[in-house]
């Protein structure tokens, strides 16, 4: 019913809710525990995807893997998240050439709690939407993007958004215009600029 009242939706500038879950850590072939405390003091990307052993998802995760070193150079940790189990994540890693490239943890959200707290859970299916969240060192959401099932995401575009978010955090009196790239001019909002752009 359209009059049903919802709780307030998650928004930019919201602090993320505490969480704790098991993840598969590629490379070490080990299962690790990841919780909200691990995020503090650094930049993070939460990359929700619908399911392991699918079609668009491995292309996205491989694209992130291909750009992983660039994210790491910027001090950004990446977490892939789906509602599959950590065992399923490992089986996918062991059997897929594309997924075999990744170095970042794949979090299991098989209780749906993380997907639900980020409001990307498709309750009727028990799967997450394609949701991307850039989280700053204070555990505050700075960028969020949700795309439909058939639309894959671009890691290079995400990298640019993270660079802009980091720049604005470090330079709070400046803003990054459209198509801004690192090293290019920014804007300093003032009355002098009104109507002149």
Language model regions located:
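Single conserved hydrophobic/aromatic residue that forms the stacking wall/gate
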Residues: 1-12
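Short, acidic, Ser/Thr-enriched surface-loop or helix-capping motifs
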Residues: 5, 24-26, 135-136
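Short loop/turn microsegments at loop-to-beta-strand junctions
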Residues: 17, 43-45, 129-131
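A short beta-strand-turn-helix
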Residues: 20-44
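Short active-site neighborhood of thiol/selenol oxidoreductases, capturing the structured segment around
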Residues: 35-64, 158
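Conserved helix-turn-beta segment immediately C-terminal to the redox Cys motif
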Residues: 52, 59-81, 96-97
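Short, internal strand/loop/helix patches
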Residues: 79, 90-129
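Thiol-/selenol-based redox modules, centered on thioredoxin-like
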Residues: 128-197
């Amino acid at each position: 019913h359209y009059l049903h009242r919802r709780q307030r939706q998650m928004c930019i500038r919201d602090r993320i809710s505490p969480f704790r879950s098991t993840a598969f850590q590629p490379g070490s072939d080990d299962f690790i525990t990841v919780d909200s405390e691990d995020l503090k003091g650094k930049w993070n990307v939460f990359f929700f995807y619908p399911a392991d052993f699918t079609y668009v998802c491995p292309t996205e995760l491989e694209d992130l893997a291909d750009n992983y070193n660039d994210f790491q150079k910027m001090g950004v940790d990446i977490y892939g998240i789906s509602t599959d189990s950590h065992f399923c994540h490992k089986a996918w890693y062991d059997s897929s050439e594309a997924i075999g490239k990744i170095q970042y943890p794949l979090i299991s959200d098989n209780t749906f709690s993380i997907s639900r707290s980020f409001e990307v859970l498709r309750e009727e299916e028990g799967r997450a939407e394609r949701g991307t969240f850039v989280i700053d060192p204070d555990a505050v959401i700075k960028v969020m993007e949700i795309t439909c099932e058939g639309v894959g995401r671009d890691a290079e575009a995400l990298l640019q958004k993270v660079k802009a978010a980091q720049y604005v955090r470090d330079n709070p009196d400046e803003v990054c215009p459209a198509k801004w790239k690192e090293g290019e001019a920014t804007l300093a909002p003032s009355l002098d600029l009104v109507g002149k752009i």
